[in-house]
Amino acid sequence: MMQDLRLILIIVGAIAIIALLVHGFWTSRKERSSMFRDRPLKRMKSKRDDDSYDEDVEDDEGVGEVRVHRVNHAPANAQEHEAARPSPQHQYQPPYASAQPRQPVQQPPEAQVPPQHAPRPAQPVQQPVQQPAYQPQPEQPLQQPVSPQVAPAPQPVHSAPQPAQQAFQPAEPVAAPQPEPVAEPAPVMDKPKRKEAVIIMNVAAHHGSELNGELLLNSIQQAGFIFGDMNIYHRHLSPDGSGPALFSLANMVKPGTFDPEMKDFTTPGVTIFMQVPSYGDELQNFKLMLQSAQHIADEVGGVVLDDQRRMMTPQKLREYQDIIREVKDANA
């Protein structure tokens, strides 16, 4: 029972403390907001008191030799003196006020007290306080020299484009020259399609070695070549040697012939060639020719080269196929 009572007292005390903190925070915030709300009124009152005090001081002051001596100097000194005096923030005199100095304005009695002493430097600063900002002083001798300076200002602005226009006039024929006649390109003559071609492949030994004659003979016979005309090997339509020859195999060394007894024979390589057009489908014959070259290269340990005796690439194979298609189209 005592523990429950103690717990209740702790909770009630915590709630009371929180309520006091919230009340104190709310009260301070309310006082602060009221303080900021009353501050602009105090500023306005203080400004009005300062303005009234300045007016009283100026009315009490007399016109002495010092003030007359300052006006007799150049007007720039008077303007600098006016700029040095602090003015209220709400005073503002638009630039167009000096352009209309002759408009009749009814001034309050305070401004008419010293009518004979217009050169006083204090009047231009205090007069805008007693009258609207857009009403100028009709008797300000310092503002008169400004009006004749406004008229000559636009003259050089309007006269500036004239020499610019004259400068551009002689450049008109240069800016728009007549286009020179462009010679028409000569018509490109279509390259005549070839009507026949020879596709060449090479099977060569690695650099610094030669192909063995006995291994070469076995691989040639396994690829379906038969020794025949011109002492070279031919691949016929039929493996038994019947039918027209599709492509042939010759020695890479001149004169390119072979000796059927090739046990003691060595050579750096052999050349396989096919003449297009040939019997049957030339593209199928080309595939068979490529397979035969790869088989011989694998058996003798050589490599397949193109007609320039460079390593065969897929791009070169596509070039061979394009040549075959071109010949077929020319003979169609």
Swiss-Prot record:
Residues 99-115, 123-175 have a biased composition (Low complexity). GO terms for biological process: division septum assembly; FtsZ-dependent cytokinesis. Residues 1-6 are periplasmic. The keyword Cell membrane applies. Gene3D superfamilies: ZipA, C-terminal FtsZ-binding domain. It comes from the Bacteria. Residues 51-63 have a biased composition (Acidic residues). The chain crosses the membrane at residues 7-27. Belongs to the ZipA family. This is Cell division protein ZipA. It comes from Shigella dysenteriae serotype 1 (strain Sd197).
